[in-house]
C-alpha cells in the first residue's frame, strides 16, 4: 500500500474526527498549546525523511484503531474517536518515516494536540497535589518552618496553605511532556530511552511543583525576605529550572543511547 493510498483511506475513515478538530480550532475552543502540538506533529511528519521507504504500514493495527474511532463516534465520544484516529495515523506513518511500528515521541505529540488537559486534571490532579504537598513539607522543615501535611495542604500553626487545582502542576506536566517529545524526536531517542525520559520528566515535574509550593509558602509566611510572591512569576522560574533539568536528562539519555535506532521495531 502506498503512503498516499494509506492517507486517503485514513481521511475517509476519520472524517468526523478531522471535522471535529477543525471546528475546535476555528471556533477558538482549542487552547494555544493544542494548536502548537498539532503544528509540531504535522511538521515532524512532513519534514521526516522516509527511513524505510519499502516498509509496510501497520494496516491491521490501524484498522482496529479506526474501528474503535467509528464506535466512539457512534457513541458520541469525540475525544476517544480523535485519539483512535491519530493513533491510526501514527501507526500508518511510523514504519516508513521512522522504521518502527509506532514512534512514541511523535505519538506523544499527537496526543498532546488533543484536548486532554481537563482529563489529566480529573485523573491526575489530586494525586499530584498530594505528592506536591508531601514533598514540600521536608523542604520547608529544612528552612526552619514547623510544617505538616494536612491532606493537600501545608499546615503551619493555625493556618493552612492549600495546594489547589491550579497549583497541581498539570499545565507544567503538559509543557514538560511537549518539551520531552520535541527533544526526543530531535535526539532520535529509542523507545526504551523515551520511556525512561517520560518517567524522569514526571519525577522532575513533581519535584519542581513541590519547590514552587514551598517557595509560595515561604513568600507568604516570610515576606520580609523579599521573595517574589507572584504565582505566575514563581511558576515560570520553577518551570525554567525544570525544563533545564529535562534538557540535561535527555542529553544524558542521548549520550547513553547514541547508537540506538529511532525506536524499537
Stretches found by the model and what they are:
Residues 72-78, 85-99, 106, 168-224:
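Active-site beta-strand/loop microenvironment that shapes enzyme catalytic pockets
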Residues 1-28, 37-54, 260-265:
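N- or domain-start disorder-to-order transition segments that initiate the globular core
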Residues 20-28, 70-82, 95-99, 119-123, ...:
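Membrane-interface helix caps and helix-loop-helix hairpins in membrane proteins
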Residues 6, 10-11, 120-160:
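Extracytosolic (periplasmic/ER-lumenal) interhelical loops and adjacent juxtamembrane/interface segments
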Residues 24-31, 159-178, 182:
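A loop-to-helix transmembrane entry motif
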Residues 35-47, 84-97, 102, 106, ...:
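Hydrophobic cores of alpha-helical transmembrane segments in multi-pass inner/ER membrane proteins
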Residues 53-63, 79-87, 99-113, 127-131, ...:
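Cytoplasmic-side transmembrane-helix entry/capping segments in multi-pass membrane proteins
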Residues 29-30, 161-162, 168, 196-200, ...:
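Membrane-interface transmembrane-helix boundary segments in multi-pass integral membrane proteins
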Amino acid at each position: 500500500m502506498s503512503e498516499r493510498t494509506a492517507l486517503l483511506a485514513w481521511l475517509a475513515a476519520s472524517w468526523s474526527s478531522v471535522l471535529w478538530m477543525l471546528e475546535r480550532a476555528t471556533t477558538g475552543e482549542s487552547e494555544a498549546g493544542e494548536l502548537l502540538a498539532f503544528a509540531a506533529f504535522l511538521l515532524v511528519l512532513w519534514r521526516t525523511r522516509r527511513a524505510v521507504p519499502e516498509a509496510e504500514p501497520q494496516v491491521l493495527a490501524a484498522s482496529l484503531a479506526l474501528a474503535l474511532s467509528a464506535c466512539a463516534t457512534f457513541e458520541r465520544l469525540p475525544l476517544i474517536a480523535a485519539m483512535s484516529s491519530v493513533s491510526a495515523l501514527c501507526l500508518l506513518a511510523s514504519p516508513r518515516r521512522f522504521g518502527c511500528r509506532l514512534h512514541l515521541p511523535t505519538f506523544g505529540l499527537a496526543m498532546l494536540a488533543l484536548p486532554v488537559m481537563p482529563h489529566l486534571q480529573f485523573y491526575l490532579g489530586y494525586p499530584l497535589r498530594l505528592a506536591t504537598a508531601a514533598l514540600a513539607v521536608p523542604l520547608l522543615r529544612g528552612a526552619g518552618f514547623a510544617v505538616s501535611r494536612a491532606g493537600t495542604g501545608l499546615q503551619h500553626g493555625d493556618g493552612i496553605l492549600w495546594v489547589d487545582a491550579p497549583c497541581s502542576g498539570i499545565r507544567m506536566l503538559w509543557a514538560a511532556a511537549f518539551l520531552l517529545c520535541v527533544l526526543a524526536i530531535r535526539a532520535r531517542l529509542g523507545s526504551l530511552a523515551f520511556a525512561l525520559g517520560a518517567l524522569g520528566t514526571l519525577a522532575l515535574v513533581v519535584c519542581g511543583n513541590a519547590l514552587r509550593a514551598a517557595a509560595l509558602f515561604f513568600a507568604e509566611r516570610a515576606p520580609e525576605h523579599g521573595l517574589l510572591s507572584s504565582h505566575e512569576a514563581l511558576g515560570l522560574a520553577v518551570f525554567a529550572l525544570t525544563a533545564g533539568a529535562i534538557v540535561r536528562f535527555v542529553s544524558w539519555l542521548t549520550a547513553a543511547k547514541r547508537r540506538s535506532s529511532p525506536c524499537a521495531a
